[in-house]
Amino acid sequence: MRDTFQLPLFPLQTVLFPGGVLPLRIFEVRYLDLIQRCQKEGAPFGVVCLTQGSEVRQAPATGDTAAAELFHPIGTLAHIELYERPQPGLMLIRCRGGRRFRLLRSEQMKHGLWTGEAEYLADDPVVPVPPDLVPVRVGLQRLLQHMQAQAQPGDELPIQPPLQWDDCGWVAHRWCDILPVSPQLKQQFLAVDNPLIRLELVGDLLARLKIGTGPEAGPA
């Protein structure tokens, strides 16, 4: 039998990768309740990328029913690391991406919140970055060094410790966090099971986008 679990879902127009940082500004009632419950219980929620619909519920032009929301079946657990309530009806949170999962079924509740039954996808094995992909790693190190040099006090960088420079999966995920490409393309990367292949695909994308990589750089 499959080892499945239930989880609340947060459909977004973005893709969260394992180890990635996701800041969110929450003001919809359905998600205020969700986040408050997750924070209280120390439980994660599932981030899934929308294929149709909006992050904020909107009624269609004809009728009073909220516009349909559709999303990819592969998502990532989001663990709340920072939780603030600066005013009533507003939450500011920062999440960290956890394990990937595949939805087996999902259901929208009466108040608009989505829940799903899911199974975990296998965690990436730690695969060292091979010599031919070292420039991809070096490019990311240089980019982080540039971000650190430009950062102002209080700025939060999109790449956070622990830094795992010799891990194909981690390097690929951090590039995917920051690359200016569509959520649909990022979703394809998320679904790749082999971390070495994922990093190779990222390297091919960097070459097409003419984003610089290089053979020489020290660790950030």
Which stretches of residues belong to each language-model region?
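N-terminal low-complexity, acidic/polar interaction/targeting segments
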Residues: 1-220
